[in-house]
Amino acid sequence: MPIRVPDELPAVNFLREENVFVMTTSRASGQEIRPLKVLILNLMPKKIETENQFLRLLSNSPLQVDIQLLRIDSRESRNTPAEHLNNFYCNFEDIQDQNFDGLIVTGAPLGLVEFNDVAYWPQIKQVLEWSKDHVTSTLFVCWAVQAALNILYGIPKQTRTDKLSGVYEHHILHPHALLTRGFDDSFLAPHSRYADFPAALIRDYTDLEILAETEEGDAYLFASKDKRIAFVTGHPEYDAQTLAQEFFRDVEAGLDPDVPYNYFPHNDPQNTPRASWRSHGNLLFTNWLNYYVYQITPYDLRHMNPTLD
């Protein structure tokens, strides 16, 4: 699926070097087809890096995807140039009267922060409430899963004693589930979080269907039966080097982090890691776009909410 982005977005050249099909707005305007409108609420500090990761995964299908980047934190960013944010991101007020086929809410490094202490917690709640009437399907990633479970289901914050970091094995629970179509019975995915997601908690306090979990009973992928919301507790979008960058950052900060599990060859941080989760990550996003967005979204987005012109 060619992703449709502004001509000047840095990701255009970055992804083209990887032979990823990126369609600029100027070229897309010549195609008579309604693109899927996907809104990305980017909560990660290094926004350009995160853009590249998610856009890569949204690029593999024959339809256009029109990407809109959203920010809700008005504080000055220490990791992303203000010019980039001003040129490529919108505020909630800019899109609150629009409808979207899909919404992706990224993770955020807030695992040890109480929800009410998050600077933009009221804005998160506002976006999630808004999405019920304005978005066909929403995909929550890592910390956003924890936030959504609290806002939508009232589940208290669950925090691990030690950070979960590494590449872990998961198994699918329903072989014919659409979101895991094409997955191997067992697959690998990276995690980097303090948030805890016991599968038993999800089963006991929600009506969500768990689609994949670990042997230890940690939920990895779950969704609502109507396909309106889906949750992935890991980071399938991560590059091969992302966990290494986080590890060495924490080492330099004097935090004495554990070496990420099942990641560095021979468990030696001096060895170059290889991504073992790319195929599953691509399948997950392709399946979400196809079965949870494209297959159920109205052709005319105004029909999602008849009060909108």
UniProtKB/Swiss-Prot annotation:
Pfam families: HTS. The record marks S192 as: Important for substrate specificity. It is found in: Cytoplasm. Substrate binds at K163, S192, R249. It is an enzyme of class 2 (transferase). One of its GO terms (cellular component) is cytoplasm. GO terms for biological process: L-methionine biosynthetic process from homoserine via O-succinyl-L-homoserine and cystathionine. The record marks G111 as: Important for acyl-CoA specificity. Pathway: Amino-acid biosynthesis; L-methionine biosynthesis via de novo pathway; O-succinyl-L-homoserine from L-homoserine: step 1/1. It catalyses: L-homoserine + succinyl-CoA = O-succinyl-L-homoserine + CoA. Its main location: cytoplasm. The active site is at C142, H235, E237. HAMAP family: MetA_acyltransf. NCBIfam families: metA. Homodimer. Belongs to the MetA family. Transfers a succinyl group from succinyl-CoA to L-homoserine, forming succinyl-L-homoserine. This is Homoserine O-succinyltransferase.
